Amino acid sequence: MISLIEQLKTRFIQALKTAFDQDFSDLEGLVVPATNPKFGDYQSNVALSLAKPLKQPPRTIAEQIIKALDISDLCEPPQIAGAGFINLTLKANFLENLLAKIQKDSRLGVEKASPSARVIVDFSSPNIAKEMHVGHLRSTILGDCIARVLEFRGHDVLRLNHVGDWGTQFGMLIAYLREVYPEALTTADALNLGDLVAFYKKAKVRFDEDETFKETARKEVVKLQAGAKDTRHAWQLLCDQSRREFQVIYNILDVNLTERGESFYNPLLPEIVGQLDEEGLLTEDQGAKCVFLEGFTNKEGNPLPLIVQKSDEGYNYATTDLAALKYRIKEDKAERIIYVTDAGQANHFAQVFQVAKKAGIIPENIEVVHVAFGVVKGEDGKKLKTRSGDTIKLKDLIDEAVAYARRDLEKRLAEDDRKESKDFINHVSQVVGISAIKYADLSQNRISDYVFSYDKMLALQGNTAPYMLYAYARIQSISREGNIDFEKLDEKAKVILSEETELALGKYLLQFTEVIEDVEINLLPNRLCEYLYELSKKFNKFYENCPVLKSEDPIKTSRLILCDLTARTLKLGLSLLGIAVVERM
């Protein structure tokens, strides 16, 4: 189903062509959702936008548009308000027919994009020999949600995990382990990731304080880069150990990724520097090869270059990112590349993208975008850390959320004198705890920082995962109470929107397509969260005002269809956020 707003835009473009013999299809905000229900369902301020180019009063333009506008099958007669706003109210019978139609559609009216595109979403990207921490939470959850929405829309999505599996830290760690625990460099699973992290910290101290050790570590890096068998084997073991523990987190979060670390692009780095040189973009500055760009300066106001080869002839993140871009466009055939990292890397990616465009790595028809996000803060307003000041491990964060959800569930069961099985308690606690973490993150505008609070994210009221899950479970309880199978509702039954709350719910259900398309374009998952929250509230109002099981047919079946559509929309919407539902809470 083409979204309602797109259908209206198409009719307006046709009307403008008829009225003024011009193509205004590129006009922004041709039709938008009404700001207030008293103005109808949708509005157009196109008459005001065209007043200057057409040299006519807005109301006169609005009158001409309405005269040429053919929407009698969709809307009540359009109304002109104020200076020339055109207000549109959808017809109840049009809405009723559309709801009956999407009730039979497993995709709830959301069509696949045409044409579809090859899209790469680069997200999560932890570092080898370091545990995943709260800083990886947003990238992992946001990236997964964006990938899910794009996949649902029919795009060919490659989810890439650009892990930090190369660099000086490996020389440092391997050199240290050769001294204190050589077995770890030859035997799989000799260490767990926690041990690796502890050894890494000790190695870093030695590296910073001991010049002899620093030189030994550098030699290990050279051996690694040269492909020395023993060093390469040790590196592989360290990577494998980290990889296994990362996968535990990904399994818990139900996140799928294809790993392609920094090391994958190593053979391509000299070629990148050579290409930049051929394009005349390189400048040597204090022995380093750099690209100076317009609009980038340091704190002193001096030009800030992008270094692509250090004075010791080593490469860096920028070189690797340029090589990755080239590979993704040339070999992966990506048409859209999305990087999901914190806002602190915005400057880096802006520079990399500009250099890549100058060098011809990014053609004009390829979209590259940095999906930036803010930091997770504690309730003290500072970056979320442990009491000792350490970064919180992601696994600990998840475990605590699940434990919190369990305590809350057991408390409610005791208050209601309800008996449930151990399996039920375990399952619901796990789903609610993980869902709460995901939803708390995704419901915020990603650009903003947000405060992490177990109390708020696990509350049964407000814009939270438990509220959404409860709304879904409540609808399932209607089917159980009435012994009704939603899948066996009469396919020929009509939807009847006679009550105000029925009409409001029906209209809102039909906006799902618009929201999914919005997230697909603007990559802001919080808009899907806002929609689902508003849908839950509209359903609650409907349920309070419109008896379902106590009604008589055809009203009863119509209201059951609205219940079913709401539950399915919640379930589908939450699944696109990476959140599972529960039938009972």
Curated annotation (Swiss-Prot):
Keyword tRNA processing: no
An example Gene Ontology biological process: arginyl-tRNA aminoacylation
Annotated motif 'HIGH' region, positions: 126-136
Reactions catalysed, as given in the entry: tRNA(Arg) + L-arginine + ATP = L-arginyl-tRNA(Arg) + AMP + diphosphate
UniProt keyword annotations, A-Z: Aminoacyl-tRNA synthetase, ATP-binding, Cytoplasm, Ligase, Nucleotide-binding, Protein biosynthesis
SUPFAM superfamilies xrefs: Anticodon-binding domain of a subclass of class I aminoacyl-tRNA synthetases, Arginyl-tRNA synthetase (ArgRS), N-terminal 'additional' domain, Nucleotidylyl transferase
InterPro entries in alphabetical order: aa-tRNA-synth_I_CS, Arg-tRNA-ligase, Arg-tRNA-synth_N, Arg-tRNA-synth_N_sf, ArgRS_core, DALR_anticod-bd, Rossmann-like_a/b/a_fold, tRNAsynth_Ia_anticodon-bd
CC per GO annotation: cytoplasm
GO molecular function, one term: arginine-tRNA ligase activity
Enzyme Commission number: 6.1.1.19
Record text on subunit structure and interactions: Monomer.
Membership in a protein family: Belongs to the class-I aminoacyl-tRNA synthetase family.
PANTHER family: ARGININE--TRNA LIGASE, CYTOPLASMIC, ARGINYL-TRNA SYNTHETASE
Protein name: Arginine--tRNA ligase
Annotated organism of origin: Gloeothece citriformis (strain PCC 7424) (Cyanothece sp. (strain PCC 7424))
